Amino acid sequence: MVNKNILKIRKQLDKLDNKLLDVIKKRSLLVDVVIKNKKFKKDIVDKRRISIILRNISKKSKQKKIDTKITHKIWKSMIKAFIDYEYRNFK
C-alpha cells in the first residue's frame, strides 16, 4: 500500500500536470498563429531559433537549479512535437 505522504505528493503532481496542459494549450494557440504567418512549408524548421531556445532554456535551468538534461530533453521533445504539428496543419 502506498503511504499517505506519497498520495498527497501525487495529487500535487496531478495539479501541476493540469497546469502544464493549460500552458501547452496556450502554446498551441500561439503556434497556430505562427503557422498562419509562414508562407512556405520550408519555413517551419528554423534551426537558428531552435538553437537559441535550447541555449536559453539551459541557461535558465541552471539559474533555477534544474537538471539541464531534464529540461533539454523536454524542450527538444516539445519542439519536435510542435514541428510535427506545424507540418500537419500547414496550409
Where in this protein do the model-derived segments appear?
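Domain-level signature for soluble enzymes in the chorismate/prephenate branch of the shikimate pathway
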Residues: M1-K91
